[in-house]
């Protein structure tokens, strides 16, 4: 009688845990410059290879190589990108300390991922709408939104533009093309596709761009967004940031073990690319390509950005419990700030002295902005928006039952 082996459930495991170094060979990598650049109007069938390779521009020596090395990227744009990334990292570090001092309740930094939001922010045009997750504060910093305004939202103080209605880091700035961040995963993909469809229906020229993490690709809204984007050829860029971890869950749990996240788009008939998210030049080049496709009615593009979440998921997380403490230092794609710095220095457009001076200038700017924000209140001082604001900004004409409740509160 034939012996049938018992069934076994496969549960993916990371190659590294505390005390055991991560083997990053699980990441399919390509050499800088070796991945081809297709024509804008080619379809997903002709480009399936791009969902499994890795678009890279900067080599180990900091030189821009290959077909994605865009000569139209001006040195001034690269300098701006480096400055925004430095400013973001300093802002993040300061807000992390503020949370530890109990001045704010919660914070999420973008350490190690700064190039992705910054590069695409500088590739988009005014009027385009971004649907970010909670690690794209550099979209706003790249647009020179006052740091004190961001801090007031974090402090939930009397000058909080959202009047305390959102969790810290869940910004909303319509005038900056920054849609309200939601704590529910993958919702922004559906929202971005719907907004892009509306833009097309109106005959507008504005496109949408959305960001989610690798873990959120397991949510049903991800598949819904892909279906609508493909069927209606929505003018949208769909960004998946594969930073290896969804809180304490390794990216393989979301489906990254046997295929890539970019490959998810192929099944929906969407042109899908996989790119180095720590290579600022690759981010700008790939973003411009996808944005141009969307703006020219060539449909959506799904981009998987390979990066690494260098810090904790949030201030409520302790990554030392589930991964090696030195993981980021051994991540093969490096630090996005150091890589762009190396490239600019190689070109003669940056120096160690300017780098040091820039850091000092932004440190002083962040401290000044923090003092201004704290003058309007923090969790320690208790200065918050008036209770009356809970009745505002919902109805054009307040219904009777809310008017009665407001009267009962005496506000």
Per-region residue spans from a language model:
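Conserved acidic/glycine
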Residues: 1-116, 311, 317-320, 325-411
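Cofactor-binding active-site loop characterized by glycine-rich and histidine/acidic residues
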Residues: 90, 97-234, 239, 250-257, ...
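Short, ordered loop/turn segments at secondary-structure junctions
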Residues: 135, 241-244, 277-278, 306-308
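Short gly/pro/ser/thr-enriched loop/turn and capping motifs at secondary-structure boundaries
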Residues: 138, 244-247, 263, 309-311
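Conserved thiamine diphosphate
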Residues: 197-204, 257-289, 332-359
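Glycine-rich, charged/polar anion/phosphate-binding loops
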Residues: 222-225, 285-292
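Short beta-alpha connecting loops at secondary-structure transitions
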Residues: 245-251, 270-276, 320-329, 353-355
């Amino acid at each position: 009688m034939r012996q049938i082996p018992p069934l076994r459930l496969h549960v993916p495991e990371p190659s590294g845990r505390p005390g055991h170094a991560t083997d990053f060979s699980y990441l399919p990598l390509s050499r800088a410059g070796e991945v081809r650049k297709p024509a804008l109007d080619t379809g997903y069938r002709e480009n399936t290879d791009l969902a499994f390779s890795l678009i890279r521009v900067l080599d180990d020596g900091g030189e821009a190589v290959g077909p994605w090395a865009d000569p139209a990227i001006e040195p001034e744009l690269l300098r701006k990108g480096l400055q925004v990334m430095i400013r973001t990292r300093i802002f993040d570090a300061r807000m992390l300390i503020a949370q530890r001092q109990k001045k704010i309740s919660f914070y999420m930094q973008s350490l190690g991922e700064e190039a992705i939001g910054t590069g695409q922010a500088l590739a988009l045009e005014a009027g385009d709408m971004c649907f970010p997750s909670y690690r794209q504060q550099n979209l706003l910093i790249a647009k020179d939104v006052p740091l004190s305004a961001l801090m007031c939202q974090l402090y939930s103080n009397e000058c909080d533009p959202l009047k305390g209605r959102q969790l810290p880091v869940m910004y909303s700035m319509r005038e900056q093309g920054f849609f309200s961040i939601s704590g529910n995963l993958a919702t922004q993909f559906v929202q971005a596709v719907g907004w892009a469809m509306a833009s097309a229906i109106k005959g507008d020229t504005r496109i949408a761009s959305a960001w989610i993490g690798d873990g959120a690709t397991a949510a049903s809204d991800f598949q819904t967004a892909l279906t609508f984007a493909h069927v209606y050829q929505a003018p949208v860029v769909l960004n998946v940031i594969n930073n290896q971890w969804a809180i304490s869950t390794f990216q393989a749990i979301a489906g990254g073990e046997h295929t890539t996240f970019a490959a998810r788009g192929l099944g929906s008939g969407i042109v899908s690319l996989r790119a180095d998210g720590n290579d600022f030049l690759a981010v700008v080049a790939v973003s411009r390509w996808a944005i141009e496709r969307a703006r020219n009615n060539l449909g959506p593009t799904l981009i998987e950005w390979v990066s690494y979440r260098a810090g904790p998921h949030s201030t409520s997380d302790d990554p030392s419990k589930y991964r090696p403490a030195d993981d980021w230092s051994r991540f093969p794609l490096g630090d996005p700030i150091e890589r762009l710095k190396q490239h600019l220095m190689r070109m003669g457009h940056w120096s160690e002295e300017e780098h040091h001076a820039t850091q000092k200038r932004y440190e002083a700017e962040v401290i000044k902005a923090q003092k201004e924000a704290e003058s309007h209140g923090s969790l320690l001082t208790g200065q918050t928006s008036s209770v009356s604001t809970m009745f505002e900004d919902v109805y054009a004409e307040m219904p009777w039952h809310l008017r009665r409740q407001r009267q009962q509160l005496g506000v």
